[in-house]
Amino acid sequence: MSWQQRIEAALVQRQHDDAYRVRQSNQGGSGRWLIQGDRCYLNFSSNDYLGLSHHPEIVRAWQQGAEQYGIGSGGSGHVTGYTDAHASLENQLADWLGYPRALLFISGYAANQAVVAALAQAEDRIFADKLSHASLLEAAAQSPATLRRFKHNQADSLQALLEKPTDGQTLVVTEGVFSMDGDTAPLPALQAQCRAHDAWLMVDDAHGIGVLGDEGRGSCWQQDIKPELLIVTFGKAFGVSGAAVLCTEPLAEYFLQFARHLIYSTSMPAAQACALSAAVNCVRQGGARRDALRRNIALFRAGFSNSSYQLMNSQSAIQPLIVGENARALALMNHLREQGVWVSAMRPPTVPPGSARLRITLTAEHQPEDINRLLTVLHHADRKL
């Protein structure tokens, strides 16, 4: 089979499976409203949980940073791309989250890949929650270490793996809040197993940081644990983009020497670091926004009465509605969009086969009438489809 034949066959199969992904440009889609063409939709697909993506202080910080530093970093942080703005943000994050060091990355995907790739050796083991993010599972699978997946959020399943002898080191990886199911990892139980078996714990808290815990310090803070490696990302509650790895001093120095994704990538613009520093302040002072988000979550869950679909047991901003078949999920998504409600369908391979879903995300910017409109449209869809 030629390259062209292989590519065409893969595309045809995706279309046959109702799993073909299509990007659609818009004129603004991070906030309460999504604008596409001449239509304005209530937006229930954005990860801008606290509504900070248009915050004037953050926008102003980016503008001022661009005026001072320019719009590009000019290179890797090991060459010219590490400015006072980057250093200040790293120190700010480390102090806030209670770690000796923080290292900035251009994305959460890059941070996860870099950490696993730099640490894992052939004699090592990586035990990952079965529903961990693709960046974690892919990095582990591509590493020389042995990858095993434990049952989702089940510490006893992890324990069974940890009890098997090994000559190498063991890294346990999980998410704080899971991106497709919206549930929270039992972090104290996982950490207890790690400590009992001399393993390290790595937590990707992309969907918990900014939302959970005192001042939005995240899932680990809320559950009173401190993993060896904490990954936080800035494309959700912070309203920007990028990521950071929180760790010890020796680990940070190790990553500066061996994390190829860090060494060989152009660093984020200094203006972005300025914006993120302002975003950290907004997150820390965002108690009212977190309260509003919690009220919206409670309102949605209390009002949901759609018996044809399964609403996952999630107390987070992510409210997955399990539909099952890909075609049915697409039909429901399109019906909602026809009614002016923008929700996205998640299908395999992003989620397990047979569990296609609408991934509804709530934000602090949503108003009660928005939630009620969503509930009404879902109720009518149950009777129509």
Swiss-Prot record:
The keyword GTP-binding does not apply. Pathway: Cofactor biosynthesis; biotin biosynthesis. The modification N6-(pyridoxal phosphate)lysine is found at K236. Coiled coil: none annotated. GO terms for biological process: biotin biosynthetic process. Transmembrane segments: none annotated. Homodimer. Catalyzes the decarboxylative condensation of pimeloyl-[acyl-carrier protein] and L-alanine to produce 8-amino-7-oxononanoate (AON), [acyl-carrier protein], and carbon dioxide. This is 8-amino-7-oxononanoate synthase. It comes from Pectobacterium atrosepticum (strain SCRI 1043 / ATCC BAA-672) (Erwinia carotovora subsp. atroseptica). The gene is bioF.
